[in-house]
């Protein structure tokens, strides 16, 4: 059993998802997530701007954010969002313990702003969700470019003058 399989079902049961729901969405998630990627969060969510568009299931791993949608009438599964965390920009979330919810927003690589509302049962779960999102988006995502740290008072290293040597033409 791979890492994704070992971590997905416990995360789904922790979120209170029925086993049927988790196993129904599993093939879609399996196509998007690598076998070595551990699940951080699985939860139901909705779209605040489209409340009647169906049920959504959000999967957050250390590398990807995947959201599936179940259509309201025929209950078909559709992939709504599949993005690496480093491809997402302007990621924000706002926890609201009074409403027992966290609103997550991110701009996908195609420029479309996605907003999801995650509801919890208790206010304490709002702060747990906030900590998970903070861990995933602030501490795990690093830029690929190395950081260059220098101070203004630092003197540059001695630069050797370029010496030119004549080339022998034959």
Residue ranges: model-predicted function:
Residues 1-59:
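Anionic N-terminal interaction surfaces
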Residues 3, 7, 74-170:
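Acidic, Ser/Thr- and proline-rich intrinsically disordered linker/docking segments
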Residues 13, 17, 23-25, 49, ...:
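Generic preference for well-ordered secondary structure
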Residues 49-75:
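Conserved beta-hairpin
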């Amino acid at each position: 059993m791979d890492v994704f399989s070992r971590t997905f079902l416990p995360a789904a049961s922790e979120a209170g998802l029925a086993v049927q729901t988790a196993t129904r969405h599993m093939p879609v998630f399996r196509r998007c997530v690598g076998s070595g990627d551990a699940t951080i969060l699985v939860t139901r969510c909705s779209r605040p701007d489209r409340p009647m568009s169906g049920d959504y299931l959000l999967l957050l791993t250390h590398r990807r954010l995947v959201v599936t949608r179940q259509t309201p009438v025929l209950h078909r599964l559709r992939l709504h969002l599949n993005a690496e965390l480093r491809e997402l920009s302007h990621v924000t979330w706002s926890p609201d313990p009074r409403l027992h919810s966290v609103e997550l927003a991110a701009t996908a690589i195609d420029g479309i702003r996605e907003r999801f509302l995650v509801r919890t049962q208790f206010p304490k779960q709002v702060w747990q969700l906030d900590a998970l999102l903070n861990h995933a988006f602030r501490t795990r995502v690093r830029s690929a470019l190395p950081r260059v740290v220098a101070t203004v008072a630092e003197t540059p290293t001695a630069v050797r003058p370029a010496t030119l040597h004549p080339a022998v033409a034959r």
